[in-house]
């Protein structure tokens, strides 16, 4: 041993080598806040230190014995009591005497080892030893003698740790620990170097090592006992009784004398290598972070018990040795876990009875506790511990700060290098910048010199001035002229009119003509804005007109017409011009010229082909101006040259729509959106004026145009009408795309005359407004609900996935009922997990089954459910990323007026809430299904049902007989539609099927939850009836609803047409719904067949061409066009000159604003309904007095639900089920609405305004 002391840091886990230091221990301890010894080495004399250390040693042994609960005889150094008590006791006394003698000669007793715990504190129940136990230990006597001799040779009173020279085995172990240390231990090494002890202290520690070798010999004896324990366990498993001697040894081995078998260790990370268990005390429970239960016993295996006690011994030894605790790195690895306790166990736990103490006793107890705590803290010098901890933490913080500063410098260097690389990369290909001259582009839509409003003044015509005048015919283009003379002429009625002799300008030869002031227009634009009905000529841009592939474009020129729309912001300050020949176009003010004279009734000056339409337009512009609402890509029937053709919307410009006709002609044309040439507008006019023809319902297409009305149209009811007396919702409502803001709702259902013979008076009665619901203006102050996002606390997380074949064993056993939860929440409460993955801007959903298998589509989920025989169904899953499965709309329970309006008839309760007043809905008997009344013969015989025999949950639509019924109906009108997109797609209906859906029925051999059974199940969605602010009662969803999900059916009384008319007069018709499936399907077929073009290709080629020369024929007919064709082929027609001038006739084919063909809307003679009887008419579903929750759905022009006809219990086409499906993802708390498909004007004397507030609102329902 060297003469100079060596400094060894106290950090146990660092294991760093010893370095020679020249500093004194006092200076180092003072620099790090440790207590400074007085004098040379210590604060106390050697004798006082020895006596105090003996006390610490005895106290430590007694605490260890008390903690383990051992009743065995203990040797002073943790060894086991031998079988011969006397002999070993004498040896122990000798060792104790020798050790005490050695301690008395030295002021230090305790030494802290760097790899285990305090040497003086050995666990009496320790069954495993260190590496030294594997070697042959020396004899106890020899060890004691060597330790005593070594203790006598100690001359220095300071404490020192062993060096690598004196303990080569320990140094080798320390080096191994250094290799396994993480990089973060450098901080502890820095702190270790700052706190050390003199090297001479290791002598006492050497002496104590001798005692540890004695204990190692005794641990070998414990191993023999362990082997006997193993034999004992084998015998217990075989059912034999253990031997008495072995039982006594086992009981003597245990700390508390009680050993248990077949128990469960409370340590969740237990390796389960031991089969012996002991009762867990509070110290071990706290170590493993387990709550104590008073109602049941808790056990620890012997290995976990020893581990906990060893760590507590290390804590106590470090504290009693007055060493900084923060220099000791205690590893305690515990994984986070959650203990699932049943509610029954919690109820069984009884609260311990509290004993009553008097105030004096309580005060005495508190004083005694305070004194005891203070004594313990003073004994371990707790104040010094706090000071040391502060110093160590500050040193670590300073070290981390220095490390962070170095990291910032390195990061800056790396960033600088990266910037240089970036610059070098992009400098290799320099970009040449070139400054171009400024380019000023004047916006084409910019408003130029919009004149102010004012009175229209027509100055008198002046001689010698330039004007515009008619050329040859009234509808031809007008050209520039000069007035040369005033003349007078006599009109047909005998009145004298002023005429003007004019000369045409820019002509190859002089041409003079006499015209009236009605055929002359001013040369300059008018100085004021023009109003509706003003007679003008306007410049027509011929480039916007296309009349076929082989036809030329009409030349641009001034043509006569009237002002249809004034300048306003909505049309970008342009005039809408209705030209005399039927064309329409928007024209700016600078291209409009005022006609010098016009009749008081301006339509008298208009060409006869457009006179009637313009007269009605001018008279009703401010009252009734219906126009078709459509979007790009939609199709509608449009009249072209006497034929109704399907045309597609190409573009929309305010009140004009650009239509492209299908067929060989394939021409485009701008048409006014209120023109009767458009099918929807023509039908509306027919409904209002033609009372003799029966009217069919509209074709329910998802993107079909509809008519929008204004609120100023009450006066239009003066027209004589004969219409039905009651309003009815159509069960075949058209579908909207609720997600598209520009999408339009379907057109209203067409009206029908009353089959029951009820007719209305020709004179319209007084208008009665039906908007009588109370409107609450202080809606913001009312208590509102809010959406709450729950989490599945009781859910068992999925297992780690291992490759296996899925079976029913993959599922968790669910003990709680799931009936009261929403369909999408059931998997998350049954051991499933729903993960939303994000990849850049794209999201995707992955379900993890209870066995850990990942499922990424509904097809995979369906296969998994079949393999595991799960009670869940495929409609309990959805892969929409934005959908919240556990979101729920919560309200104040105090405003709930009825907890369940179905009175238990539905599986899911339907509450009723009202936070406006205390009113309740009108009384209604709840009915889950339809109820036939007198005269309704509902045939429910199962023998008339077609059935299937599928065994694959009807997943193969090509083999299922029920699916084939649905597929056949769809492919009748759309043969190329893929079979995967027809009908339900894993119990989701994404679009309306006009021809109906046929579900599997009671005769089918498939399972009750097959993929073709949706509507026949009862309500599963959580819905809520509530009072709206302006529309009466409504229905909203409590949870999120995915797109295509089934909501409910519409149930009520089934009525005949006659009963509906009679009941409508008495009780009202607001809950009527037509079962009009047959009419819808038949008209869909008619619309499909009407797309076929049966006209002559030769006639179509020249219809409306610019070479038409007969101005007297304003309605070109088929015979005339054929005649023109023949004469053209024979060469009898005159070729036009190649050089055009203003003199050339620029006449266009006349286009009539009114159609030249009637749109057949009469009842088909071969209708399927006629097969059921001569007077057979659609049946009516009435939910006025009896019905289900479907009666509470309000109307919306942009609904989130659509209606689907489904055949379940009968295949009779007259009696489909009316089912509601979601048209889009509906968030919780949203009101559910559908399109009533009322038609405006079909009920005389009734006006109902729409208050849905949708962007495409029709404004009126009736």
Curated annotation (Swiss-Prot):
Span of domain Tudor: 529-602, 629-686
UniProt keywords, alphabetically: Chromatin regulator, Chromosome, Coiled coil, Developmental protein, Differentiation, Metal-binding, Methyltransferase, Nucleus, Oogenesis, Phosphoprotein, Repeat, Repressor, S-adenosyl-L-methionine, Transcription, Transcription regulation, Transferase, Zinc
Annotated SET domain residues: 1021-1237
Chain ranges of the MBD domain: 818-884
GO terms of biological process kind: epigenetic regulation of gene expression; female germ-line stem cell asymmetric division; heterochromatin formation; heterochromatin organization; methylation; negative regulation of gene expression; oogenesis; transposable element silencing by heterochromatin formation
Compartmental location: Nucleus; Chromosome
The protein, known as: Histone-lysine N-methyltransferase eggless
Lineage, broadest ranks: Eukaryota, Metazoa, Ecdysozoa, Arthropoda, Hexapoda
């Amino acid at each position: 041993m060297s003469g100079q002391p060596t400094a060894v840091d106290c950090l146990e886990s660092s294991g760093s080598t010893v370095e020679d230091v020249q500093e004194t221990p006092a200076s180092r301890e003072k620099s790090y806040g440790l207590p400074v010894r007085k004098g040379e080495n210590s604060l106390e004399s050697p004798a006082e230190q020895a006596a105090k250390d003996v006390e610490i040693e005895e106290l430590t042994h007694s605490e260890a014995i008390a903690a383990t609960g051992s009743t065995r005889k203990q040797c002073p150094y943790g060894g086991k009591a031998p079988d011969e008590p006397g002999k070993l006791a004498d040896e122990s006394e000798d060792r104790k005497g020798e050790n005490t003698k050695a301690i008395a000669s030295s002021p230090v007793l305790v030494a802290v080892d760097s790899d285990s715990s305090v040497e003086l504190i050995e666990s009496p129940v320790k069954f495993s030893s260190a590496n030294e136990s594997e070697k042959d230990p020396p004899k106890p006597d020899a060890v004691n003698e060597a330790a005593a001799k070594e203790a006598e040779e100690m001359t220095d009173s300071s404490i020192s740790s062993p060096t690598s020279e004196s303990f080569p085995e320990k140094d080798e172990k320390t080096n191994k620990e250094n290799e396994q240390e993480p990089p973060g231990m450098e901080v502890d090494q820095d702190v270790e170097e700052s706190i050390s002890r003199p090297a001479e202290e290791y002598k006492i520690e050497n002496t104590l090592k001798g005692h540890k070798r004695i204990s190692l010999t005794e641990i070998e004896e414990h191993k023999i006992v362990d082997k006997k324990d193993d034999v004992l366990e084998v015998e217990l498993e075989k059912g034999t009784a253990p031997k008495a001697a072995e039982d006594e040894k086992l009981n003597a081995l245990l700390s508390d004398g009680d050993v248990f078998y077949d128990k469960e260790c409370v340590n969740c990370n237990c390796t389960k290598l031991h089969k012996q268990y002991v009762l867990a005390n509070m110290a071990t429970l706290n170590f493993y972070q387990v709550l104590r239960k008073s109602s049941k016993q808790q056990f620890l295996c012997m290995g976990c018990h020893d581990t906990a006690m060893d760590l507590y011994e290390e804590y106590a030894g470090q504290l009693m040795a007055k060493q900084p605790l923060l220099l000791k790195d205690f590893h305690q690895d515990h994984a986070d876990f959650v203990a699932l306790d049943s509610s029954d166990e919690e109820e069984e736990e009884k609260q311990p009875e509290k004993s009553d103490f008097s105030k004096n006793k309580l005060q005495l107890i508190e004083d005694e506790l305070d004194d005891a705590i203070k004594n313990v803290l003073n004994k371990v010098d707790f104040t010094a511990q706090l000071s040391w901890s502060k110093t160590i933490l500050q040193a670590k913080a300073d070290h981390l700060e220095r490390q962070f500063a170095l990291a910032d410098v390195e990061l800056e260097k790396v960033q600088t290098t990266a910037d240089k690389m970036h610059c070098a990369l992009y400098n290799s290909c320099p970009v040449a910048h070139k400054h171009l001259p400024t380019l000023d582009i004047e916006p084409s839509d910019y408003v130029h010199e919009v004149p102010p409003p004012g009175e229209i003044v027509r100055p008198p015509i002046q001689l010698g001035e330039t004007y515009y005048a008619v050329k040859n015919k009234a509808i031809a283009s007008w050209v520039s002229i000069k007035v040369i003379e005033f003349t007078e002429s006599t009109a047909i009625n005998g009145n004298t009119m002023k005429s003007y002799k004019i000369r045409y300008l820019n002509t190859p030869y002089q041409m003079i003509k006499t015209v009236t002031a009605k055929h002359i227009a001013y040369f300059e634009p008018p100085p004021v804005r023009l109003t509706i009905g003003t007679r003008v000529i306007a410049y027509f841009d011929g480039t916007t007109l296309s009349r076929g592939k082989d036809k030329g474009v009409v030349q641009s020129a001034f043509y006569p017409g009237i002002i249809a729309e004034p300048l306003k912001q909505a049309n970008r300050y342009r005039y809408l011009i209705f030209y005399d020949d039927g064309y329409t176009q928007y024209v700016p003010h600078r291209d409009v010229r005022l006609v010098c004279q016009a009749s008081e009734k301006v339509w008298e000056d208009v060409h006869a082909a457009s006179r009637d339409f313009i007269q009605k337009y001018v008279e009703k512009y401010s009252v009734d101006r219906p126009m078709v609402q459509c979007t790009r890509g939609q199709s509608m029937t449009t009249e072209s040259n006497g034929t109704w053709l399907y045309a597609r919307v190409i573009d929309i410009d305010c009140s004009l729509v650009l239509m492209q006709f299908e067929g060989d002609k394939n021409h485009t044309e701008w048409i006014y959106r209120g023109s009767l040439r458009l099918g929807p507008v023509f039908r509306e006019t027919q409904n209002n004026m033609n009372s003799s023809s029966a009217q069919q319902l509209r074709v329910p297409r998802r993107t079909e145009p509809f008519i929008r009305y204004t609120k100023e149209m009450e006066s239009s009811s003066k027209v004589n009408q004969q219409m039905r007396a009651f309003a009815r919702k159509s069960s075949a409502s058209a579908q909207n795309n609720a997600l598209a803001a520009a999408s339009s709702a379907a057109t209203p259902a067409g009206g029908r005359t009353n089959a029951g013979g009820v007719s209305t008076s020709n004179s319209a009665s007084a208008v009665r407004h039906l908007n009588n619901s109370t409107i609450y203006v202080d809606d913001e102050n009312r208590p509102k609900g809010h959406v709450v996002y729950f989490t599945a606390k009781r859910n068992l997380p999925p297992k780690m996935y291992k490759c296996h074949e899925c079976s029913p064993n993959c599922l968790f056993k669910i003990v709680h009922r799931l009936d009261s939860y929403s369909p999408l929440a059931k998997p998350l409460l049954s051991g499933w997990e729903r993960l939303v993955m994000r990849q850049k801007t794209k999201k995707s959903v992955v379900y993890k089954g209870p066995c850990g298998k990942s499922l990424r589509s509904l097809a995979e989920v369906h296969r998994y459910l079949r393999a595991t025989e799960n009670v869940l169904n495929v409609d309990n899953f959805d892969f929409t990323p934005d959908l919240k499965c556990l979101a729920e709309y919560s309200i104040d329970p105090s405003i709930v007026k009825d907890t369940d309006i179905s009175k238990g008839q539905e599986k899911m309760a339907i509450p009723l809430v009202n936070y406006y007043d205390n009113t309740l809905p009108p009384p209604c008997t709840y009915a889950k299904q339809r109820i036939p009344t007198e005269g309704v013969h509902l045939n429910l015989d199962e023998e008339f049902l077609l059935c299937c025999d599928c065994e694959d949950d009807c997943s193969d639509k090509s083999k299922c007989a029920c699916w084939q019924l649905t597929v056949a109906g769809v492919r009748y009108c759309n043969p190329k539609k893929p079979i995967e997109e027809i009908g339900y797609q894993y119990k989701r209906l994404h679009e309306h099927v006009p021809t109906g859906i046929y579900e599997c029925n009671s005769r089918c051999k498939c399972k009750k939850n097959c993929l073709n059974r949706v509507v026949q199940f009862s309500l599963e969605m959580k819905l809520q009836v509530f009072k709206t602010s302006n529309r009466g009662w409504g229905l909203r969803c409590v949870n999120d609803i995915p797109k295509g999900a089934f909501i409910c059916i519409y149930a009520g009384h089934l009525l005949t047409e006659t009963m509906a008319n009679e009941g409508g007069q008495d009780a009202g018709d607001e809950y009527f719904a037509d079962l009009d499936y047959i009419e819808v399907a038949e008209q869909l077929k008619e619309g499909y067949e009407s797309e076929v073009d049966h006209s002559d290709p030769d006639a179509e080629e020249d219809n409306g061409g610019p070479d038409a020369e007969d101005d007297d024929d304003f309605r070109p007919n088929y015979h005339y066009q054929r005649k023109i064709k023949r004469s053209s082929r024979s060469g009898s027609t005159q070729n036009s000159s190649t050089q055009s001038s203003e003199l050339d006739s620029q006449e266009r084919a006349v286009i009539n604003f009114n159609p030249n063909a009637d749109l057949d809307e009469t009842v088909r003679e071969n209708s399927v309904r006629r097969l059921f009887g001569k007077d057979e008419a659609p049946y009516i579903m009435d939910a006025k007095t009896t019905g289900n929750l479907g009666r509470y759905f309000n109307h919306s022009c942009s609904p989130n639900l659509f209606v689907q006809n489904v055949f379940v219990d009968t295949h009779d086409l007259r009696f489909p089920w009316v089912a509601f499906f979601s048209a889009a993802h509906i968030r919780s708390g949203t009101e559910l609405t559908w399109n009533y498909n009322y038609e405006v004007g079909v009920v005389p004397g009734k006006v109902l305004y729409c208050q849905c507030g949708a962007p495409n609102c029709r404004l009126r329902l009736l």
